[in-house]
Amino acid sequence: MKNQNLSVRKLARCGMVAALYVVLCMALQPFSYGAVQVRVAEALCLLPVFGAEYIFGVVLGCFLANLLGSTIVDVIFGTLATLLACLVTYKLRNIRFKGLALAASLPPVVFNAVIIGIEIAVMFPDPTSSAPLWLACVTNGISVGIGELISCTVLGVLLVRIIEASPSVRKVFEA
């Protein structure tokens, strides 16, 4: 019975994380979508630092948010980028720099910069530009990467720090 209660608790936490991701994206919609974006909900990509079950919650939230506010291509590739980012974030969860989860914040930045940068360049080419596709991919990747740095390396690391600093809050997030 105790294992069943633990599973129900983990499932409930995943559902809450997914819902929070969607709510943050919808509430901050002008900032959450497009080539220039700071998707505040991406700070939640650092929650796998506290357990693998958060991978599912964040990925589900990303999938639903993209389903509600983006294209089918972004539903697929944006969700894939978030899945890969969360998996690697989980693997890097114990690497700390001066006590901060900085290493864990980098996978969302890198995966989203590369995957979404390419997606935007291919799906929304600038008809007024004669620049090669690779340059558009790099330019869009830098733009997305800067937004992800703000969301994950600033807000996400701060979120992890706040959770870890409070034993009662940390207990809620850990298995």
Region annotations inferred by a language model:
Residues Y21, V58-N66:
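Small-polar-interrupted transmembrane alpha-helices in polytopic inner-membrane proteins
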Residues P48-V58, R93-L102:
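Membrane-helix interface "capping/anchor" motifs
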